[in-house]
A protein has these predicted regions:
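N-terminal hydrophobic membrane-entry segments
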Residues: 1-237
């Protein structure tokens, strides 16, 4: 566990990381960081002030906002001043890992993305330089871990990760997987013989795919709905 203590004289905030005995003077107060308002709020409730470590087991990863410039985390059993942070930056840290946060940092723990052959992910590049230097964790359809080839990315680029090629994926720093409602994994469309699907691109161009096939849309494509409902059309015999 850890807690933030702020000095009332100079406003400096220290991170107290357990195991440690905390004694609060009259010139100090406990504070908590509100991620919505991006402000520190004073509290006299120790149960509210103390926070648990950000922990990710094997096969999970942490999305950490505002990392320290040197990549360090608060030391255990110490009270530490906050180092200079990379405000506005975001990095991905693969598990297993466990650490407390510096004041102003925000973290989200995400399970690695498991894909069946008829599922896919859509990911977005938010930091092209970092994405080109980082390496994703990828397991292919045969269960073998593969090293992703370094690519040239551009900010805003959308990527489709197909379950026919990848069975497990954890994005490197610079790439984020886009959520689809309550899940990250999206279902492709499976076509049988005499069935087909129509995909419409942002430029109005249509693509027809005939079964049997598993159809993965491009990032800019959407399925055209059938008059009978759904996105699968039946060919005339």
């Amino acid at each position: 566990e850890f807690v933030f203590i702020q000095s009332k004289t100079n406003g400096q905030i220290k991170t107290y990381t357990g195991p440690i005995m905390v004694t609060i003077s009259a010139q100090e107060s406990m504070v908590v960081f509100n991620p919505k308002t991006k402000r520190f709020e004073e509290t006299a409730d120790f149960e509210k002030a103390r926070q648990i470590f950000t922990s990710a087991p094997e096969g999970w990863y942490v999305v950490l906002k505002n990392p320290s410039i040197d990549g360090t985390h608060p030391d255990s059993a110490k009270a530490m001043n906050s180092p200079e942070l990379q405000i506005g930056k975001k990095i991905n840290i693969s598990g297993p890992c466990s650490f407390s946060l510096f004041p102003g940092q925000m973290a989200k723990v995400v399970q690695g993305h498991k894909l069946r052959s008829n599922q896919y992910l859509i990911a977005r590049v938010y930091d092209a330089d970092a994405a080109s230097k980082s390496v994703a964790t990828i397991v292919d359809a045969e269960g073998k871990e593969v090293k992703a080839e370094t690519e040239k990315y551009f900010v805003g680029q959308l990527l489709v990760i197909k379950g026919t090629e990848v069975s497990f994926y954890m994005p490197p720093t610079g790439i984020e997987v886009i959520a689809n409602k309550d899940s990250y994994v999206r279902d492709a469309v499976t076509l049988e013989r005499l069935e087909y699907a129509i995909l419409k691109d942002e430029d109005g161009e249509k693509r027809y795919v005939h079964g049997p096939a598993v159809v993965f849309p491009k990032p800019t494509e959407t399925f055209v709905n059938s008059p009978k409902g759904g996105v699968i059309f039946r060919a005339l015999e």
